[in-house]
Amino acid sequence: MQKDALNNVHITDEQVLMTPEQLKAAFPLSLQQEAQIADSRKTISDIIAGRDPRLLVVCGPCSIHDPETALEYARRFKALAAEVSDSLYLVMRVYFEKPRTTVGWKGLINDPHMDGSFDVEAGLQIARKLLLELVNMGLPLATEALDPNSPQYLGDLFSWSAIGARTTESQTHREMASGLSMPVGFKNGTDGSLATAINAMRAAAQPHRFVGINQAGQVALLQTQGNPDGHVILRGGKAPNYSPADVAQCEKEMEQAGLRPSLMVDCSHGNSNKDYRRQPAVAESVVAQIKDGNRSIIGCLLYTSDAADDR
């Protein structure tokens, strides 16, 4: 690493990581698994477009910190998914990266041993191995697209992705979303702004050119065709925004932007005032609105973990 008066002044070290194609060669998908993931992505796309009448439910722990616990959760999740499959399409939330307002543990990929060692290469390997086991169980998987390089390593294993409230306004993440090979939900801003998510959805639907990495780990100019499967996620802000009036306002703003209203409700975060025990009340409101004839709500997000796990 070159370090002098002008270069890398605030960088203390660098480590070259394995490339995406090396990781995939070590932990490959089978043809059957590829077909399964493609099918689940199509199902979610059909739900977003209104071609499938079921409700999309993305559910799981706030973040993954222990693979064995995640597998035990997945076994229960699979049984529930089969039980409700006529009316609900359950997708397991498997988040490895945690956005932080200031500092804190950034997730299993960044610090898999949770000891400040930041063994990212081990984190990528642990994450891909776990995802393959979950896919092998027949589960569709969801994540938050946070680091722009992570999708090259793990994106082929996911069926749905979210762009979080802190990153929805980021041009980098809008460009990345335009190239993701799966449906993407955009959360409203932390202040509750709908325009942030709606503008992100519009931007991601368009073609983009941006600098990223390819499967060989080379820096490359990537060109996208745009992602047609975007939708808004209402996650609350300074106040909850899941009421019928809030949903109607979102529908209105999406229509004014030339978009077909399609939205999910995040039952946590600002909509539950960050109290996990309030999630059922939010979900009940979503169900009531759908029973009353709402057709723009395509799903909801639920968070399940060990009580008030706030990692």
Q: Would you name each region that the model predicts?
A:
Residues 2-8, 87-242, 246-247, 270, ...:
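Active-site-facing alpha/beta catalytic cores
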Residues 14-48:
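N- or domain-start disorder-to-order transition segments that initiate the globular core
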Residues 37, 41, 64-65, 70, ...:
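Metallocofactor- and cofactor-centric catalytic cores in central/energy metabolism, strongly enriched
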Residues 49, 82, 134-136, 255-258:
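Acidic (Asp/Glu)-rich catalytic clusters
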Residues 60, 265:
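Conserved, mostly hydrophobic/aromatic
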Residues 65-81, 118-126:
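Glycine-rich anion/phosphate-binding loops
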Residues 296-302:
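Thiamine diphosphate
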Residues 303-310:
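Conserved small/polar residues in nucleotide/adenosyl-binding loops
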